[in-house]
Amino acid sequence: MKHDHFVVQSPDKPAQQLLLLFHGVGDNPVAMGEIGSWFAPLFPDALVVSVGGAEPSGNPAGRQWFSVQGITEDNRQARVDAIMPTFIETVRYWQKQSGVGANATALIGFSQGAIMALESIKAEPGLASRVIAFNGRYASLPETASTATTIHLIHGGEDPVIDLAHAVAAQEALISAGGDVTLDIVEDLGHAIDNRSMQFALDHL
């Protein structure tokens, strides 16, 4: 399967866990791989891969899963849905390559990468056992949820790009649907990942 990716860690013996990272619009898998390097030492038996978006973003080295040009609350879900089969296929490709099942797979995303990770579990329940969504949101809130996947929402309290209210609404929707979810708010943080965000993520994994 041909897609942009950067292998952060590949264990010598068969992998016991699979950690897949997904970047934001205009970023690339190598840059997001730096986030993966925080997880790798704590999970020496994990295959850790940073996956690039499916299409170029206009920025020379940047990738994206869907365009944000002219995006609205009304058309966001359709854009996510259009590329979702490719996203799910990518996750399944790495599960097959690693020999790791969904029960030991974690999807870790920032911004648009977090949107895709969250939406993938909505589209394909049980695709992974954990999602860590840094400064993400749902395109539209889930009406059903499964405890087969634990969702960890980590969000900057001062995010000007994806308002904290989206994470709060996601938590409330998942709880109402009977899902397994946590929300950690990083005070005074904008649309970014910092050491505090990472510590929340590491504590959950």
Give the label of every model feature segment.
Residues H152-D159:
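Short beta-strand/loop motif that positions the catalytic acidic residue
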Residues E34, E119-A123:
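Active-site signature of alpha/beta-hydrolase-fold catalytic machinery across serine-
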Residues I108-G113, A117:
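Gly/Ala-rich beta-loop-alpha elbow adjacent to hydrolase catalytic centers
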Residues A165-L205:
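C-terminal catalytic histidine-bearing segment of alpha/beta-hydrolase fold enzymes
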Residues V30-A31, P160-H166:
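Conserved alpha/beta-hydrolase "acid-adjacent" motif
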Residues G126-Y138:
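A conserved short beta-strand
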Residues Q17, T149-T150:
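Alpha/beta-hydrolase fold active-site loops
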Residues K2-A104:
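Serine-hydrolase catalytic machinery in alpha/beta-hydrolase-like enzymes
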